[in-house]
Amino acid sequence: MSMFLGTHQNRFDAKGRVSIPASFRAALKSQAQPGDPLVILRPSHLHPCIEGWTVGAFASLATPLDEYDPFSEDHEDLAASLYADAYPLDSDKEGRIILPENLRTHAALTDEVSFMGLGRTFQIWNPEAAAERRQAARSRARTLATSRRPASAPAAGNTAGAAE
């Protein structure tokens, strides 16, 4: 399975298009089925960014909806939050897309954007906000990693009590 890796910065052109990084395009194309759009974009519920999904990964988000009565308010709210602001997009031959204005506004995008790989998905950020998010994520990841370490495993670099 192709993954979305790294952080890449691109600029909008005069027509408002931005190029999806080549490695991200390759990952999207490798997972697309005939007739599928290249990517599905939607606003993040957690951050001021845009989420990028393959059709398959996006479809997996709908699985929990099957647990709800399709005529219930809960189902309708979840479906609206998932689908109403989702945009299936294809790129031109150069790999450029035009981001819908409401997504650009949600992510506070102006001239430049950062594409941030998250493994099976990616995000599109304002570059300054992306840098802050990456720093916060690294800090939190350190905390999570140390809090989940088994008691019997010494911390990296900690050789206290190790046999000599």
UniProtKB/Swiss-Prot annotation:
Protein name, as recorded: Transcriptional regulator MraZ
SpoVT-AbrB domain residues: 7-57, 86-129
Pfam family, any one: MraZ
Upper taxonomic lineage: Bacteria, Pseudomonadati, Pseudomonadota, Alphaproteobacteria, Acetobacterales
Protein location: Cytoplasm, Nucleoid
Keyword terms of this UniProt record: Cytoplasm, DNA-binding, Repeat, Transcription, Transcription regulation
Domain of life: Bacteria
Organism name: Gluconobacter oxydans (strain 621H)
Main location: cytoplasm
Region (Disordered): 133-164
Signal peptide: none
KW Lyase (keyword) present: no
PANTHER family found in the cross-reference section: TRANSCRIPTIONAL REGULATOR MRAZ (PTHR34701:SF1)
Compositionally biased residues, Low complexity: 142-164
Family: Belongs to the MraZ family.
Gene Ontology CC: one annotated term: nucleoid
Molecular function in Gene Ontology: DNA-binding transcription factor activity; transcription cis-regulatory region binding
